[in-house]
């Protein structure tokens, strides 16, 4: 059985979890995440609430991984993007008035 190396990544604002995993060829994304033990390191990660991707492309948990893949676990948005832009515009206008 051939062994491949993949990286499982989950990033928070102040800390990053990066786990190198040696796993059998033909394994799935879910297998690699379980092997990384990332689910036990933080309570923020869940198969039901987080999207998963490989190199910024969303994939399903049953997707077969290849040697060298970087499996990324994405965080949920904490603020609506439209609301964030509104707040930024408001702050930038406020700062312009000061100067």
Swiss-Prot record:
SUPFAM superfamilies: MoaD/ThiS
Top-level taxon of the source organism: Bacteria
Gene3D superfamilies xref list: RnfH-like
A Pfam family matched in the record: Ub-RnfH
Record InterPro entries: Mopterin_synth/thiamin_S_b, RnfH, RnfH_sf
NCBIfam families: PRK01777.1 (NF002490)
Protein family: Belongs to the UPF0125 (RnfH) family.
Protein name from the UniProt record: Protein RnfH
Species this protein is from: Buchnera aphidicola subsp. Acyrthosiphon pisum (strain 5A)
Name of the encoding gene: rnfH
């Amino acid at each position: 059985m051939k062994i491949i190396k993949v990286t499982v990544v989950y990033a928070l604002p102040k800390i990053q979890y990066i786990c190198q995993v040696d796993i059998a060829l033909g394994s799935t994304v879910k297998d690699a995440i379980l092997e990384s033990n990332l689910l036990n390191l933080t309570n923020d990660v869940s198969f039901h609430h987080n999207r998963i991707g490989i190199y910024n492309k969303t994939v399903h948990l049953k997707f077969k991984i290849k040697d060298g893949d970087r499996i990324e676990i994405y965080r949920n948005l904490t603020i609506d993007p439209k609301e964030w832009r509104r707040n930024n515009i408001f702050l930038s206008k406020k700062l312009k008035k000061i100067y």
